[in-house]
């Protein structure tokens, strides 16, 4: 999850820089704020989709009640492997 957190921070920083430096420079223009809000909402939506996919796969494949260690990249779950077939 650290990788997703760092990825999210990098994407938000990149969007912030793009919005500040590449949007119209008119003083009365609200385009900068609108574009930043749209990009920020898109990023939150992406995180929500990834969260739903991870929860779905976790519910489908694993029961976190005991069994053995499953080593994921940097994270260890103590769980029992279970496949709904």
Swiss-Prot record:
One of its GO terms (cellular component) is kinetoplast. The keyword Ribonucleoprotein applies. Keywords: Kinetoplast, Mitochondrion, Ribonucleoprotein, Ribosomal protein. Signal peptide: none annotated. It holds the Pfam family Ribosomal_S12. It is found in: Mitochondrion matrix, Kinetoplast. Disulfide bonds: none annotated. It comes from the Eukaryota. Belongs to the universal ribosomal protein uS12 family. This is Small ribosomal subunit protein uS12m.
